[in-house]
Amino acid sequence: MTIKLHHLRPAPGAKSDKIRVGRGEGGKRGKTAGRGTKGTKARKNVPAAFEGGQMPLHMRLPKLKGFTNPFRTEYQVVNVGDIARLFPEGGQVTVEDLVAKGAVRKNQLVKVLGDGDLTVAVQVTVDKFTGSAKEKIAAAGGTATEL
């Protein structure tokens, strides 16, 4: 016989009613409801992070040091090697061109770093350059202009 969804049944003993505790004193789990007598564990609940009195983990760990500079400027970075790969024919390279090629996100500041080699002359116009990037662009016959 093939198994069908409407023939499926839970295994015997798999389903049992939940035990309702603290309902009258005559039954097995009345009065103290299986919690024993008195003490913290008998009263309401114990915090999930409570470790029995030892120094809790969140107090054993060190506090974070330092601060976050609210005036920090973050740049999208592009290497000279990436420019050489994306623009093999050279020419003008602006932030919009880099966004169009998928090298950086739009509406973000762009910085060119000096990793990689450049063989064609490119006129790069972005927000910032490193010293090595300027040198490599100039050595290839191009210009590096900051916005």
Swiss-Prot record:
Which InterPro entries does this one have?
Ribosomal_uL15 (IPR030878), Ribosomal_uL15/eL18 (IPR021131), Ribosomal_uL15/eL18_sf (IPR036227), Ribosomal_uL15_bac-type (IPR005749), Ribosomal_uL15_CS (IPR001196)
The protein's UniProt keywords, in alphabetical order, are: Ribonucleoprotein, Ribosomal protein, RNA-binding, rRNA-binding
Q: Where is this region: Disordered?
A: 1-45
Could you provide one GO biological process annotation from this protein's UniProt record?
A: translation
Comp. bias intervals (Basic and acidic residues): 15-28
Summary of subunit composition and partner proteins:
Part of the 50S ribosomal subunit.
NCBIfam families listed in its UniProt record: rplO_bact
Instruction: State the similarity comment.
Output: Belongs to the universal ribosomal protein uL15 family.
The protein depicted here goes by the name: Large ribosomal subunit protein uL15
Tell me the organism: Rhodococcus jostii (strain RHA1)
User: Source gene?
Assistant: rplO
